[in-house]
A protein has these predicted regions:
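ATP-binding/phosphotransfer module of carbohydrate and carboxylate kinases, centering on a glycine-rich
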Residues: 1-4, 24, 52, 179-288, ...
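Short beta-strand scaffold segments in enzyme catalytic cores
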Residues: 12-18, 149, 156-161
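Intrinsically disordered, low-complexity terminal tails and inter-domain linkers enriched
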Residues: 18-43, 280-306
Length: 307
């Protein structure tokens, strides 16, 4: 089976996928991760979300991951492949050692040179984060194009994919959580409040004022950027707009533009990237990128600009 790790600044999300030809037997008892919600993807056997800690040791991460498997009656021996998308370089070496020590697998990292199948029409494709790349690949595979992905995490990322499956670019905004943190850290007399959707915009006390401004102000940011993206794409373009990320369910319901919520989109993108690269990298280590002259538009790689 394939273990996919989406390593973000705040959380690390793990997904366990069945691969074609796998026969996991009784080890996988259901597609429920314990949260009461089964996976929309029948190949996703289980998934977990943990806090990303840069100071965790190899053994601390290893014990944590093994315990997650054991809590769901899954043996770590079912893992034959691992793919990692990380935006936290300090933990990369630690996670590689975790994979080798506790799963006996040499992981594949999403990094420059990986085959994406998506032309990158941007100035510097190597700047695109691994999680953003996975989002784009999964969104186009699942919804077709044109489409827009809004990933709500520590930062909120907007990704735009054309009707032909080309990555056109996007935008990055401070996430809802760090936006609120900035307010509380710079305004000494304001009391920190829980971030949640208030019942009305016009608050009647300081807590209500803050929750309204933070939440509905952020909805305005999201819809404002989406409206401008749609304007640049032109009136004849009607992209499918999907939200993902840890805060997607909280925010997307109030958006005027977001049509779907797909919380497993990044993990699905990692699964797709693994399938596209498993033969080229049988042990999961990144190989040297092919010469730029070999990159076809339908087989673009990170680090190669197409078009």
């Amino acid at each position: 089976m394939l273990l996919a790790l989406d390593v973000g600044n705040t959380n690390t999300v793990l997904g366990l996928y069945g691969l074609e030809g796998d026969n996991p037997g009784p080890a996988i008892v259901s597609a429920d991760n314990g949260s009461g919600e089964g996976s929309a993807n029948p190949r996703l056997a289980a998934h977990w979300r943990v806090t990303t800690h840069r100071a965790r040791t190899v053994d601390e991460y290893g014990v944590l991951f093994v315990n997650l498997f054991e809590m769901h009656g899954i043996s770590t021996s079912v893992v034959t492949h691992i793919i990692i998308a990380s935006v936290v370089p300090p933990v990369d070496s630690t996670l590689r050692q975790v994979c080798e020590k506790y799963f006996h697998v040499d992981p594949m990292f999403v990094e420059p040179g990986i085959k994406t199948g998506m032309p990158m029409l941007v100035d510097n494709p190597t700047e695109l984060g691994a999680d953003r790349l996975a989002d784009c690949v999964a969104a186009y595979a699942r919804y077709g194009g044109p489409c827009i992905v809004v990933d709500f995490g520590t930062a909120t990322k907007f990704e735009v994919i054309s009707a032909r499956g080309e990555y056109l670019g996007g935008a990055i905004s401070p996430g809802l959580g760090i936006s609120a943190d900035a307010l509380f850290s710079h305004a000494a007399r304001l009391t920190r409040v829980d971030i949640k959707r208030p019942s009305k915009v016009i608050g009647t006390n300081t807590i209500g004022h803050l929750q309204s401004g933070i939440f509905f102000g952020y909805i305005g940011l999201v819809d404002g950027i989406l409206e401008r993206i749609l304007g640049e794409l032109g009136a004849g373009t009607q992209p499918h707009i999907v939200a993902t990320g840890g805060l997607a369910r909280m925010i997307a319901a109030d958006s005027r533009f977001i049509q779907d919520i797909d919380e497993m989109l990044t993990l699905e993108g990692l699964r797709i990237l693994f399938e596209r690269n498993r033969n080229a990298r049988p042990r999961g280590r990144a190989q040297e990128a092919r010469s730029s002259g070999q990159g076809a538009r339908t087989e673009a790689r990170v680090g190669e600009r197409q078009g």
